[in-house]
Every structure is written in C-alpha cells, then in structure tokens.
A protein has these predicted regions:
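RNase H-like nuclease fold core
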Residues: 1-86, 97-98
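RNase H catalytic domain
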Residues: 26-33, 38, 71-74, 78, ...
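Loop-to-helix element that buttresses phosphate recognition and phosphoryl-transfer chemistry
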Residues: 87, 91
Length: 191
C-alpha cells in the first residue's frame, strides 16, 4: 500500500484485480511430519474483492483437497510429507490449476498467509526443501502468468480477514475429514 499525501487515505498500489483467489493450508500435528501426516488446502475464488478483509465481492468457487504424498497417485505433484508448508504450496497449485481451467485472460491475484509458499510459488525464493513440489508449482505459475497478469500478496493469518479465514476453514475441515460449514452459517474464525 502507499499513502496518498493529499488526503491521507490508504490506497492499493494497483487496481483490484477481477479475480482474487485465497489459499490456505492446514496440517494436523505439524511436528515430526511424514507422508501419512494429514494435511489439506483450501481455495476460495472471489470476484470484485476489495482486499480489505470485510468479505466484499462475490464468492464464485470454493474447494478443499488433501496434500497427496504418494507418487503415482492422482493429484500427486511432488509433496513428500504432509505439513503446513506442503499444504500451502498445494493450495497455490490448486489456485493455479483453477485459473488454467477458468481460461480467462484478466488479472488475477492469489492471496495467502504464507510468505514461504507465495515467494516460492512465484519464483522469488529458491527452494531448499520440497523441491519437486516447488518446481511443479512454479511451472504452473509460469504457465498461468504467460496467459494473464498474475500476482500474489500476503494477508495476515487469523486476523478476521473473511476470505482468508474461509480458506483456512475449508483446509482445516478437510484435514479433519469433516464437511465445511455452509457459507451462510459460517462465521470468520470458526474452524
């Protein structure tokens, strides 16, 4: 954000993109993780989001899925263990695959509470761990960014940001093997 000196209002550096995709990961017992540690990701797609966290815009799609750690299994993209980090990266992969399937060419922004996943997915950082997973997510990033303007931004976790909290809810419920609370009955912060 930049501060406008004339009237002292905070405004975004760029116009809000038409599509904003919120991703989050969840892992049960994120210590001493291995291939059997339950971990999942959540994805929320919003049209017309202001980015302020109040829940503006229209929710057009949401989904959740597991971190797949078995090579050769459907959905495996290189994760070796279930962890918060592999779940966050898998969430980025889901968002990027969704953008490819959506097929548009308008600007898209992915918002996440993991700087680790965002900087690795976008190629800002070089992977020291999860190399195969990161390489596959970066390949998806490159494919999508060749078709449309693509960016990512950080959102603070567990601060009441409605769409980030919804992605967190989807990921946590999936990791627990539970169905998410329908949006009309769900409250931010509810896992």
């Amino acid at each position: 954000y930049r501060l406008q000196s004339r009237n002292w209002r905070v405004s975004p550096l760029v116009d809000s993109p038409g599509l904003t995709l919120y991703v989050d990961g969840s892992c049960l017992g994120n210590q001493n993780v291995d291939a059997s540690t339950p971990a999942s990701w959540g994805l929320v797609v919003v049209i017309g989001d202001s980015g302020l966290g109040k829940g503006s815009g229209e929710l057009t799609h949401e989904e959740a899925g597991p971190v797949v750690t078995s090579p050769g299994s459907p959905g495996h993209i290189g994760a070796e263990v279930g962890s918060n980090n592999t779940a966050e990266l898998s969430g980025f992969a889901a968002a990027l695959r969704w953008l490819l399937m959506e097929g548009g060419d308008g600007a898209a922004m992915i918002r996440a509470d993991s700087t680790y996943a965002g900087n690795l997915a976008s190629g800002v950082w070089k992977a020291k761990a999860n190399r195969e997973l990161v390489a596959n997510v970066q390949a998806l990033w490159d494919e999508v960014s060749a078709l449309r303007p693509l960016s990512w931004s950080h959102v603070k976790a567990h601060r009441g940001h409605r769409w980030n909290e919804r992605a967190d809810h989807l990921a946590a419920r999936h990791a627990l093997g539970e169905s998410p609370v329908p949006l009309t009955f769900w409250k931010p912060g509810q896992r």
